[in-house]
């Protein structure tokens, strides 16, 4: 630890400004098992030493400020300060570093993602000495993660409630996302569910607009769910978006969903906020509702490689805040997502223990200590030809959602749903028989087309559709 002579009561107070690195850069520090660890991608301004910038990040996100203050002498600074304990240059970049910072657990309120992020990604991101700053990863120690409830129910409980095992769940976002009346919206839900999907979904910006108020939508969707369940003998659901302008209104919508007996609701956790999300997760846990989480606004925060917060951090904090599902990208669809990076944060969402693996962007070993898992949701520009890759990439514990890939079927919504269900079951069967979907996936789909005219029609419509653009956020 660096000496703090000027801030200890016995040494007296010395006013003035000093380098951050004299106090907050501690390369000899031995990390404690209870420390919260952060990895920042840091780009200093020209002429600013990396050690000074790393120390500034540690200081400004914990106990420090720009000048010495006399009240430093009234606290145990060595106990509470953040420490930049390691720096490593980023390969291939001339002035970029990974700064590792350790934060004492006592700096953070128990069970509060809001407080955690307010400290770690607060004012420091506007610090002038930094050209850019990105939070790449967090290590949440068991001593802190055990103060969070996590997902309302988790993957296994959801499987048991749905009585569906051994395959990915299938969903569909109702389109057009805005403009339908509640009755027509409910009709689309019914057709998709009776066609073979497990879930349908409100889009992220479906709340309670003049063309479709939330209560009407909830009632018509519930009617569709019950009718489809009766016809198919399967448990069905629709993600009813409870996101609202106030927490009181959000609770009202969640309560109504519970009263009419639907199995799952939805929340936009970034636009709605972590405090609202944690509160809603607790309500869902107490009232038997599954909670689907949409990540609207995430790309504003995580898409740029050099500045912001990586999605793996947003995924970790959502698991702590509470969510049974979370949109995670597709790798193969229309939305940003590199394969190894995506697989890394998918594991962080649903596995109990994840080893450090820099090849997948995982900077720290993460032990969730029994916290329930969050199911990844692949959604955005996917269709039946993507099914082999999605099955191979995500495995069984995922929800694959085909919006346009269901509702765009030339024969209608129910045939579109049937095409996706047939494609999924064909891929799962082929995988279980030992076939390599990465090489034989196209053949598997073509074989299934022989006994499913719905799938054959879907394959013909989308045979030329690809989204091949270079990924911006790479390792």
Curated annotation (Swiss-Prot):
It is an enzyme of class 4 (lyase). One of its GO terms (cellular component) is chloroplast. CDD domains: RuBisCO_large_I. The disulfide bond which can form in the large chain dimeric partners within the hexadecamer appears to be associated with oxidative stress and protein turnover. Belongs to the RuBisCO large chain family. Type I subfamily. Heterohexadecamer of 8 large chains and 8 small chains; disulfide-linked. The disulfide link is formed within the large subunit homodimers. This is Ribulose bisphosphate carboxylase large chain. It comes from Euglena gracilis. The lineage of its organism: Eukaryota, Discoba, Euglenozoa, Euglenida, Spirocuta.
């Amino acid at each position: 630890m660096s000496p703090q002579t000027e801030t200890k009561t016995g040494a007296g107070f010395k006013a003035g400004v000093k380098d951050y690195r004299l106090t907050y850069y501690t390369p000899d520090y031995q990390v404690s098992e209870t420390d919260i660890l952060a990895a920042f991608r840091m780009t200093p301004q020209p002429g600013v030493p990396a050690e000074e910038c790393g120390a500034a990040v540690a200081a400004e996100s914990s106990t420090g400020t720009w000048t010495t203050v006399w009240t430093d002498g009234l606290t145990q600074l060595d106990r509470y300060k953040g420490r930049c304990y390691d720096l490593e240059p980023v390969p291939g970049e001339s002035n970029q570093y990974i700064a590792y910072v350790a934060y004492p657990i006592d700096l953070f309120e128990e069970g509060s993602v809001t407080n955690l992020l307010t400290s770690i990604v607060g004012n420091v991101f506007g610090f002038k000495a930094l050209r850019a700053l990105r939070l790449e990863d967090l290590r949440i120690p068991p001593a802190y993660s055990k103060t969070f409830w996590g997902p309302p129910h988790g993957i296994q409980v959801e499987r048991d409630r749905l009585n569906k095992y051994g395959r990915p769940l299938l969903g569909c976002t109702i389109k057009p996302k805005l403009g339908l009346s509640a009755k027509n919206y409910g009709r689309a839900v019914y057709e998709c569910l009776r066609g073979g999907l497990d879930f349908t979904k409100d889009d992220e910006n479906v709340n309670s607009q003049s063309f479709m108020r939330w209560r009407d939508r909830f009632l018509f969707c519930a009617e569709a769910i019950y009718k489809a369940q009766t016809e198919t003998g399967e448990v069905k659901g629709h993600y009813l978006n409870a996101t609202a302008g106030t927490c009181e209104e959000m609770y009202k919508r969640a309560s109504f969903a519970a009263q009419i007996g639907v199995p799952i609701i939805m929340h936009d956790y970034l636009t709605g906020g972590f405090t609202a999300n944690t509160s809603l997760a607790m309500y869902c846990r107490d009232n038997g509702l599954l909670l689907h989480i949409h990540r609207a606004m995430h790309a504003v925060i995580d898409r740029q490689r050099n500045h912001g917060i990586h999605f793996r951090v947003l995924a970790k904090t959502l698991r702590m805040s509470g969510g049974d599902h979370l949109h995670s990208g597709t790798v193969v669809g229309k939305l940003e997502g590199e394969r190894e990076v995506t697989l890394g944060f998918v594991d962080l969402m649903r596995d109990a223990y994840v080893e450090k693996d820099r090849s997948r962007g995982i900077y720290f070993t993460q032990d969730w200590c029994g916290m329930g898992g969050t199911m990844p949701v692949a959604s955005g520009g996917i269709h039946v030809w993507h099914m082999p890759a999605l099955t191979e990439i995500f495995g069984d514990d995922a929800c694959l959602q085909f919006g346009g890939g269901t509702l765009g079927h030339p024969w209608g919504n129910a045939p579109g749903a049937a095409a996706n269900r047939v494609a999924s079951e064909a891929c799962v069967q082929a995988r279980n028989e030992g076939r390599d979907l990465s090489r034989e996936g196209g053949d598997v789909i073509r074989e299934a087309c022989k006994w499913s005219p719905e799938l054959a029609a879907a394959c013909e419509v989308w045979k030329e559709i690809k989204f091949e653009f270079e990924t911006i956020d790479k390792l």
